[in-house]
Structure formats: structure tokens, C-alpha cells
Swiss-Prot record:
The gene is ccmE1. This is Cytochrome c-type biogenesis protein CcmE 1. Keywords: Cell inner membrane, Cell membrane, Cytochrome c-type biogenesis, Heme, Iron, Membrane, Metal-binding, Signal-anchor, Transmembrane, Transmembrane helix. Residues 131-151 are annotated as: Disordered. It comes from Pseudomonas fluorescens (strain Pf0-1). InterPro entries: CcmE, CcmE-like_sf, NA-bd_OB-fold.
């Protein structure tokens, strides 16, 4: 093999190794940051993985919110009107968090079927519904509830 061909082959191999390493790093970073969305029905049916960060969303059941008297721990139930799942959270809930409205919780599913959330997202206003929650409600044959009029 002449020296010019050998040099080209080394350059091509170096480029392939570099591209392979870049793709590998990108896939690794994406895999760590992807949080798949699961409905309460999917979680109750065992479709959601345990001890893996997921997003769980639905409507907060009325009367299900329980606040700890001595800490920031809260517990509530989220439903898609077919099945429900309990979510626990330690922290301050968003100002827009209310029973009967849509939320998305990010956390891990434990062995008891409870989502231990480290982040809770509430809808922006009375008409907004997270797209995943809207789709889940539509798939279950329900429509998003209309907001209660205040005043």
C-alpha cells in the first residue's frame, strides 16, 4: 500500500471513530433525559417501569389531597377516569395546583405502585391541559372537565 493510500485510510478510520464516539455520547445523554409519559391506567396495569424516571399525568381527584402537618410531604391521587394512581411529593406544590385539574408529575414508580415525584407541573390556566393528559383523557373516552366558575 502506498503512503498516500495509507494516510487516507488512517484519516477515514479516525473520522469514523470520532463520529461513532459522538453518536454514542449523544445517545447516552438522550437516554438519561428521556422521561416517558404514562397514564394512571398504564401504571395500574404494570406497563410503567419501576425505579425509572417517568412522567405520570391526569386529573387530581377531588378530596384526595393530603398534606403532612409537620413537613412539606403531600399525597394525592391522579386519575384518567378509568384507573387511579397515588402520587407522593415532598416540596411546595405549584400555585396553580388544585383538585379536579390536570397535572404532570415527574418521578419514579416504587414497588407499591406509588409514584414518588420530585417535580409536579400544574396547568397554566383553566383552559390549558398538558397535551399528554388531553390525549390520555380522549383515549379513555372522557373529555377534559370544564373549569368551575369562581365568584
Amino acid at each position: 500500500m502506498n503512503p498516500l493510500r495509507k494516510k487516507r485510510l488512517i484519516i477515514i478510520l479516525a473520522i469514523l471513530v470520532g463520529v461513532g464516539a459522538a453518536v454514542g455520547l449523544a445517545l447516552s445523554a438522550l437516554q438519561q433525559n428521556i422521561n416517558l409519559f404514562y397514564t394512571p391506567t398504564q401504571i395500574a396495569n404494570g406497563e410503567a417501569p419501576q425505579d425509572t424516571r417517568i412522567r405520570a399525568g391526569g386529573m387530581v381527584e377531588k378530596g384526595s389531597l393530603q398534606r403532612s402537618t409537620d413537613s412539606l410531604d403531600v399525597k394525592f391521587v391522579v386519575t384518567d377516569f378509568n384507573k387511579s394512581v397515588t402520587i407522593t411529593y415532598r416540596g411546595i406544590l405549584p400555585d396553580l395546583f388544585r383538585e379536579g385539574q390536570g397535572i404532570v408529575a415527574l418521578g419514579k414508580l416504587n414497588a407499591d405502585g406509588v409514584v414518588v415525584a420530585d417535580e409536579v407541573l400544574a396547568k397554566h390556566d383553566e383552559k390549558y391541559m398538558p397535551p399528554e393528559v388531553t390525549k390520555a383523557l380522549k383515549d379513555s373516552g372522557q373529555s377534559a372537565p370544564t373549569p368551575a366558575k369562581e365568584g
